[in-house]
Swiss-Prot record:
One of its GO terms (molecular function) is NAD binding. PROSITE patterns: DAPB. GO terms for biological process: diaminopimelate biosynthetic process; lysine biosynthetic process via diaminopimelate. It comes from Ehrlichia chaffeensis (strain ATCC CRL-10679 / Arkansas). This is 4-hydroxy-tetrahydrodipicolinate reductase. It is found in: Cytoplasm.
Length: 267
């Protein structure tokens, strides 16, 4: 069996290290390269020795080399690096999977950049979260007169708020209600706060601890509350999800894809 060669941008970050370990243990894929910033002292070292797994490739600071040696590239970094990766992916005609979060990434119109490659962008590669989004969409449609509240708890270091996962769930709820997502946000504590309309989606954000990820979506009427919850127990969840998504994406024709596309294809 020929294994898929996967390059990893940001290979020594938290998510990058998990990806290196997960892919190295897979019978279906192998790490073809790991990228770090120019000037990183680990450039030229054996990736597996740094991360602590069975991976013999050398760490590089050349984005071009990473794409040339890979069948597909995964990046979980920042919006600026994401844009560089898109340009290089188009140049080298290689599929790209991105899990970069933050407002700048969320506001990008990827169809303006993607012309000749398969590309998947998501703020959460967890199968559980994406299944939850489907349930939330259906509940929002059926429970059309219930208030919708989304609460999240993340580690104290998380920069974006609400999180990308909360936005996935909010978009699903807005789709179920058939209302524009931009019109459906109602964030606690803002100067614009006013009386909540039934078709607005409330967001509450908590931060604390070092390694938390917990999301709740509540549908509330005068008589009852229905509560959906997703809690991450092990961050390896994201590496497993990214690997599954990459193995699917590498077989697709050019286009912009979502996790929903992938999950619909494997049903």
């Amino acid at each position: 069996m020929t294994r898929v060669n996967i390059g990893i941008v940001g290979c020594l970050g938290k998510q990058g290290r998990r990806l290196v370990s997960e892919i190295s243990a897979s019978p279906y894929a192998q790490v073809s390269g790991g990228l770090v910033r120019s000037g990183n002292p680990h450039v030229g070292q054996i990736l597996g020795e740094v991360v602590g797994c069975d991976c013999s490739v050398k760490i590089t600071d050349s984005l071009e080399h990473l794409f040339e040696t890979s069948d597909i590239v995964i990046e979980f970094t920042n919006p600026d690096m994401l844009l560089e990766c898109i340009k290089m992916a188009e140049q080298k005609k290689k599929p790209l999977l991105s899990g970069t979060t933050g407002p700048a990434a969320t506001e990008m119109v990827f169809e303006d950049y993607i012309k000749s490659i398969p590309f998947l962008w998501t703020t959460n590669v967890s199968f559980g979260v994406n299944i939850l989004a489907k349930l939330v969409q259906e509940a929002a449609k059926k429970l059309f007169d219930y208030d919708i509240e989304i609460w999240e708890m993340h580690h104290r270091y998380k920069k974006d708020s609400p999180s990308g996962t909360s936005l996935i769930l909010g978009k699903a709820a807005a789709k179920g209600r058939n209302v524009p997502f931009q019109m459906a946000q109602y964030v606690r504590g803002t100067p614009q706060e006013a009386r909540k309309d039934v078709n607005t989606i409330g967001y509450s954000v908590s931060r604390g601890g070092a390694d938390l990820s917990d999301h709740r979506v509540m549908f509330v009427s005068d008589e009852e509350m229905i509560d959906f919850n997703h809690r991450t127990l092990n961050k390896n969840l994201y590496a497993k999800g990214a690997l599954k998504a990459a193995l699917w994406l590498v077989k697709q024709p050019p286009g912009v894809y979502t996790m929903s596309d992938m999950m619909a294809a494997v049903e």
